[in-house]
């Protein structure tokens, strides 16, 4: 193998080793910050040598990107799970939106430190920013397809769904991160749902 040639693991043990590096590296970066974490620390946390890390990853940025791919799936796709397995119509959309908001809030709580670190990096790292933009659009299209399959109006649906996603995302950020004491979150949830129902 050439120096600095990146391996793609095939055997189960090697795959597990790579996954351990991703998990350990991602958790460390989210805990300490990207610029306060080095590859040697990631190797120690994963229980491997630094050389092993460099067999699978060019640098800690590659580890972070792989971690973000897993984190993004955990954050985005629970919202889709709420909608994908049941019949949706105007009569039960209120109920579905409440479940979606609850799922989104819980995922933000579970990944609060990770979310804060990653969101800060979307402003300075083009690759990470592009990854999140692509995921947002993919989620918009997936939810739009689910609504279309259930008979909802197709007119401006991508735009409507994208606005709805951001309303829910902003609401979750308020509940999990900002926590303004003068705001009633039950009222805010009702207002978000009411507005989404009005334009979907």
Report each predicted region and the residues it spans:
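N-terminal intrinsically disordered/low-complexity leader segments
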Residues: 1-16
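Alpha-helical bundle regulatory/interaction domains
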Residues: 2-6, 50, 61, 67-71, ...
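Helix-turn-helix
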Residues: 16, 20, 28-62, 66
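Short hydrophobic clusters on alpha-helical segments that form packing/core surfaces
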Residues: 21-29, 104, 168
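A conserved beta-strand->loop->alpha-helix hinge within the catalytic CA
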Residues: 41, 91-96
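Amphipathic alpha-helical packing segments from all-alpha helical-bundle domains
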Residues: 73-81, 95, 102, 106-110, ...
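Amphipathic alpha-helical segments used for helix-helix packing
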Residues: 83-84, 105-127, 173-178
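Hydrophobic/aromatic-rich alpha-helical bundle segments in the mid-to-C-terminal region
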Residues: 116, 148-195
């Amino acid at each position: 193998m050439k120096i600095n040639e990146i391996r793609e693991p095939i055997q189960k043990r090697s795959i597990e080793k790579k996954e351990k590096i991703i998990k350990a590296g991602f958790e460390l970066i989210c805990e300490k910050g990207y610029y306060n974490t080095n590859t040697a620390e990631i190797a120690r946390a994963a229980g491997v040598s630094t050389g092993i890390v460099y067999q699978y990853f060019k640098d800690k940025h590659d580890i972070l990107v792989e971690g973000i791919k897993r984190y993004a799936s955990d954050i985005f796709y629970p919202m889709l799970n709420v909608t994908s397995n049941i019949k949706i119509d105007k009569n039960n959309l209120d109920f579905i939106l409440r479940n979606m908001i609850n799922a989104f809030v819980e995922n933000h709580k579970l990944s609060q430190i990770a979310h804060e670190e990653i969101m800060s990096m979307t402003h300075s790292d083009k690759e990470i920013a592009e990854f999140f933009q692509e995921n947002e659009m993919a989620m918009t299209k997936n939810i739009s397809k689910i609504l279309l399959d259930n008979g909802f109006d197709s007119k401006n649906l991508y735009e409507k769904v994208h606005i709805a996603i951001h309303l829910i995302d902003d609401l979750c950020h308020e509940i999990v991160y900002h926590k303004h004491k003068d705001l009633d979150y039950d009222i805010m949830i009702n207002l978000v749902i009411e507005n989404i129902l009005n334009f979907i």
